[in-house]
């Protein structure tokens, strides 16, 4: 299967389940022109199959540059690992103007939204069932699974973490994107300074 690049056929569990008592925020990027880093961040959870068992992966991405700012693995679907990823991204890269999620209970929970509200970040949420509203990170998941997860069938959590970490580093640092003139996500997020001549 690995050599033939065959994708296993199975029904992935849903990673987004709405909580009936949690507040749902409107989708803010609908008519927004995104022109700079830290204007909009997004996050999502995906299912990571292993040879025996599975894990859940959450990532925080800068929408403009496509750079993965942080990520976490967990064997449960609680909000804790999502909050850890959010706090890490904010500690390393500051705060976005808008933070977009789906309507999953992890992201609508009071603990998660409190982190954003305390930082005065505007909260945005996809329309129900509208994966296209968070298409940037959905494309990331597709590439990660096709190029890393399905080709390796990791045995353990540590192997999975190492493999995903290597892939994300390569994605951030080496993969060019046509939308940014073939710059990598890291280059688009942190444009190189123009060399200026210093007057004598």
Where in the sequence are the language-model features?
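Charged DNA-binding/catalytic regions of mobile-element recombinases
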Residues: 1-200
């Amino acid at each position: 299967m690995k050599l033939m690049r065959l994708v296993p056929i199975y029904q992935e569990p849903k990673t987004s389940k709405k909580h009936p008592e949690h507040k749902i925020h409107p989708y803010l990027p609908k008519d927004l022109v995104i022109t700079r880093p830290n204007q909009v961040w997004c996050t999502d959870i995906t299912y990571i199959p292993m040879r025996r068992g599975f894990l859940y992966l959450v990532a925080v991405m800068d929408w403009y540059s496509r750079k993965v700012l942080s990520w976490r693995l967990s064997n449960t679907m609680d909000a804790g690992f999502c909050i850890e990823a959010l706090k890490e991204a904010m500690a390393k890269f500051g705060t976005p103007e808008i933070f977009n999620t789906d309507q999953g209970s992890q992201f609508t929970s009071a603990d998660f939204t409190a982190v954003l509200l305390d930082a005065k970040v505007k909260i945005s949420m996809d329309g129900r069932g509208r994966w296209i509203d968070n298409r940037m990170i959905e494309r990331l998941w597709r590439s990660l699974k096709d190029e890393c997860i399905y080709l390796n069938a990791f045995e353990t959590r540590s192997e999975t973490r190492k493999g995903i970490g290597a892939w994300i580093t390569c994605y951030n640092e080496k993969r060019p994107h046509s939308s940014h003139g073939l710059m990598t996500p890291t280059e688009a997020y942190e444009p190189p300074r123009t060399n200026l001549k210093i007057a004598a």
